[in-house]
């Protein structure tokens, strides 16, 4: 089945900024996250699709390759082996032009092929953990350097020998008509060396399957979509080549009270209609504890109150966002007879018809508009 366009997956234009891409990813990651979809396999696949699109489009090199070559430009099978990393932009040129124009590309491609694959680890955090930062231990299945042969692939006491076919170059030259074509050496597979006495543990690969335990320091202020790079903590390279990197992908779980947008936090504050009418102080939650909020008299539902510097401290700039409280006026329920009497008295005290305009201007204006509408229909 053909892959969907990454921009289409995230619902953004091809010209979208990194900020737009991040906002789209955050929205879709929350929508399709397995915690919310309760084992729905189709939703799980959509979640993976969204993650893949985000990973490519927020990496400038991978995005450039994708924009020019489509999915072929970021195909992991064209890069340095394994299913964890993304494809290498340079490999496209190496495959197409390297054999024709000689060893410049070929030498580079040899080292890329031997480097360990990059890995990705999905880390879930609560909002509090993301805002405050923390150190976490993670366990990552990977290919690690073989301790028995120290990553060489050769049995202790022996070493790899220089390939006699390519004389250690990893490439051989063949003529095709007028062209001298460089190709990977068929004898050593492009490595330049041959292991004649391989290690009994790793069978000449220089690496073995292992689960590593790593400590990750999560900086305060991270958000869904942020990535933490751990250099050289990916898969070990073949036969002592450099290791890949580990990317820890952050996902912040949905909070019961707060919603986050950038460095600002939002919450809905239920308010009795009497308190909304006469005003006063109420307590509202923040991530540091409760604070007092002064409600102005005659507050209407939907009104926003901003508490400065009660949001999230930016992981990049250090500036602190705000907490925005949205008032939701609550209609009382389960009233006893006395409470109903008092409310009825209040209702009657406000008068009828035009007399209500003073205390309930919106209601009065609405019914005046309705009356005018029907008057116009009959005239």
Swiss-Prot record:
The keyword Repeat applies. CXXCXGXG motif repeats lie at residues 146-153, 163-170, 185-192, 199-206. GO terms for biological process: chaperone cofactor-dependent protein refolding; DNA replication; protein refolding; response to heat. GO terms for molecular function: ATP binding; heat shock protein binding; unfolded protein binding; zinc ion binding. Keywords: Chaperone, Cytoplasm, DNA replication, Metal-binding, Repeat, Stress response, Zinc, Zinc-finger. Zn(2+) 1 binds at residues 146, 149, 199, 202. It is found in: Cytoplasm. Zn(2+) 2 binds at residues 163, 166, 185, 188. Participates actively in the response to hyperosmotic and heat shock by preventing the aggregation of stress-denatured proteins and by disaggregating proteins, also in an autonomous, DnaK-independent fashion. Unfolded proteins bind initially to DnaJ; upon interaction with the DnaJ-bound protein, DnaK hydrolyzes its bound ATP, resulting in the formation of a stable complex. GrpE releases ADP from DnaK; ATP binding to DnaK triggers the release of the substrate protein, thus completing the reaction cycle. Homodimer. This is Chaperone protein DnaJ. It comes from Pseudoalteromonas atlantica (strain T6c / ATCC BAA-1087). The lineage of its organism: Bacteria, Pseudomonadati, Pseudomonadota, Gammaproteobacteria, Alteromonadales.
